[in-house]
Amino acid sequence: MPDPLLPLLPSPQDADRPWLVCYGIDERVELTGHVLSMWLAKIAGFVTSESTPGDGVHVGLPPHWRSVAWACGTWLAGRSVLLGSSTHIHAAGLLPELSVAFAPESLVEEAEAQALVPPASLALRWPGELPALVLDGAADLMHYPDRFTPVSTTADSVCLRDLAAEGAAPAAPGTTAATVPSGERPTTLTRAQLVARVETAGASTGAGNRSASRAVLVRSPDTAQMLQEVLVAWRAGRTAVVLTPEADDDVAAAAIRQEGITA
């Protein structure tokens, strides 16, 4: 069975519209599908070059355009994404092949490779000196090609392990964020299961409604929930407008107004 996840991801041909917009405090970043696909390709190249397949790539990042890029780039490389803190990782007895985070203390020290990513949306390198043996999760990506041939994997391959599954916060009033279907949220999903959940969430929220606005607000403190909502938006041909955890109600209102989000 072919990989059902890859068709949801942007490709170099998707240059006609923004796929992802990220709002933070005094920050707005817009990425077309073409530009985003280049980031995914570089990340996939980095992942496959710097690590060998293990228990997964630890993406220790909060909701942000970079966490979307690292998760999707990991999937492009045929690997699984691990979400949660180093404590969660240790408790589960897992050994990531790569750990990526915004802060040194959030890295999993036992990972085969580690990379620090600058939290500033437009930064192209880590600000300051890197700890010993830790890679720059922005500058070091620039050495990799803008295109990447997806690593062949199957629909039943695990793609997401959410070790911090504690239930996602409800969507903000006035948004069309796709929520996780009722019931306890699973901590492990195959590629087929993730796509099925995206399809179910999209159907339950009317994400493909032709009268809906071209963009959808994604506001969740939970990275796993944020990733699902982004995929729901993309599957419906809409722009995912992600708010970072620091973005307050004023930023949300500005994003809704500027991006023309209505429903």
Where are these regions (language model features)?
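Actinobacteria-biased recognition of intrinsically disordered, low-complexity terminal regions
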Residues: 1-17, 27, 49, 206-212, ...
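ANL superfamily AMP-binding
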Residues: 17, 34-59, 76-79, 88-89, ...
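Preference for solvent-exposed, low-hydrophobicity sequence contexts
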Residues: 114-167, 178, 188, 250-251, ...
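Conserved short alpha-helical elements in the N-terminal third of ANL/AMP-binding
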Residues: 73-77, 224-240
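AMP-dependent adenylate-forming
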Residues: 8-31, 147-189
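Conserved AMP-binding
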Residues: 61-64, 218-223, 240
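Short hydrophobic alpha-helical runs that function as membrane-insertion/retention elements
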Residues: 81-84, 115, 240-243
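Conserved ATP-dependent adenylate/AMP-binding module captured primarily in the ANL superfamily
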Residues: 82-110, 122-135, 197-215, 246-263
